[in-house]
Swiss-Prot record:
Protein family (similarity comment): In the N-terminal section; belongs to the acetylglutamate kinase family. ArgB subfamily.
Keyword ATP-binding among record annotations: yes
NCBIfam families the UniProt entry points to: argB, PRK04531.1-1, PRK04531.1-2
Residue numbers spanned by region Acetylglutamate kinase: 1-252
Pathway per the UniProt entry: Amino-acid biosynthesis; L-arginine biosynthesis; N(2)-acetyl-L-ornithine from L-glutamate: step 2/4
UniProt record, GO biological process: L-arginine biosynthetic process
One GO MF term: L-glutamate N-acetyltransferase activity
Name of the top EC class for this enzyme: transferase
Alphabetical UniProt keywords: Amino-acid biosynthesis, Arginine biosynthesis, ATP-binding, Cytoplasm, Kinase, Nucleotide-binding, Transferase
Site feature: Transition state stabilizer: 26, 231
Cellular localization per UniProt: Cytoplasm
Name recorded for this polypeptide: Acetylglutamate kinase
PROSITE patterns, A to Z: GNAT_NAGS (PS51731)
Amino acid sequence: MASAKEISQYLKRFSQLDAKRFAVVKVGGAVLRDDLEALTSSLSFLQEVGLTPIVLHGAGPQLDAELSAAGIEKQTVNGLRVTSPHALAIVRKVFQASNLKLVEALQQNGARATSITGGVFEAEYLNRDTYGLVGEVKAVNLAPIEASLQAGSIPVITSLGETPSGQILNVNADFAANELVQELQPYKIIFLTGTGGLLDAEGKLIDSINLSTEYDHLMQQPWINGGMRVKIEQIKDLLDRLPLESSVSITRPADLAKELFTHKGSGTLVRRGERVLRATSWDELDLPRLTSLIESSFGRTLVPDYFSNTKLLRAYVSENYRAAVILTDEGMLGASALIYLDKFAVLDDAQGEGLGRAVWNVMREETPQLFWRSRHNNQVNIFYYAESDGCIKQEKWKVFWYGLENFEQIQHCVAHCATRQPTLLG
């Protein structure tokens, strides 16, 4: 799945969190129905490595089937299911059955799990005349969840709410998840779906979204349809009210471990992210912080005269100095400027966040041609292969490029890389 170093890095990061701040996992009813085995396997694995997720589930398809069988026509207003007293009895039955099905499947898989079908969401009527017995969450009681976590058991929660007087109300599972997340402030919010993530215009998976740099551009795309638009808006609203380190992952149950424990992931990772600073001179940057970023990222020391001897063209640095791209001006060849990628640095604790890609994407938008070199054992080479138009292997280096127009340019850039002096010691 990944290197032992990667897995260990993420496990250490997650293990340092308070138990209830690790992850809230939202499971749709379709996943419970169609992918229960993969779901229980992934959740059990997390428990095996010492992590206990908090699981909240829906039961939409199951509820549709039971209501239809009872002769109750589905009625929605503003996307919310209108719930009559007769329907509520079926809602309770279906939620409890779905909850127990997941809890029993986890227990059969060797995991410890606790069924929590009430006592978490205190609610009031959303609008009784319009929606019937549908609730709006007013308070979240963490006591049942904390008791489960203290016992080392996965809390499995339904989205049923209760009024202070004890009336059960049907609460939309997405709304319940949002309120739970606001109360817990978790490091990870995970939506498990059949699609495994958000898809672009060509049906390809979007691996990461940095909202600070990509949200406005993304929302202008014609292929962002109504459902996806609402989902992205909801995620942004959610993350805007959480700590900067919190993130949303959308993935398949079978890919949950890969999404959590590898830099590459397997789904769509959405973060509020950081703004990307753009500089054209070293004076515009905090050089001690930039030095620390570069040296920490590469595990080596910059040569003492690096900044005085390096002719900066542009630098792109995340606002908290956790990722940076440094470009240098290597003169002209004919009518074309030669731009060299001198450094691409990402701190270990930012690996897997999509922050490096966000900085790279900002750079690439205004850099139509680029060349660079990388050591043969550099783990980033997989990314470089995907981003480049070509690669030539030298004795010590791989030379990458994109946007170069002819063989003369490529030949010149390859020769430059062969003789360029290293700027990192050790």
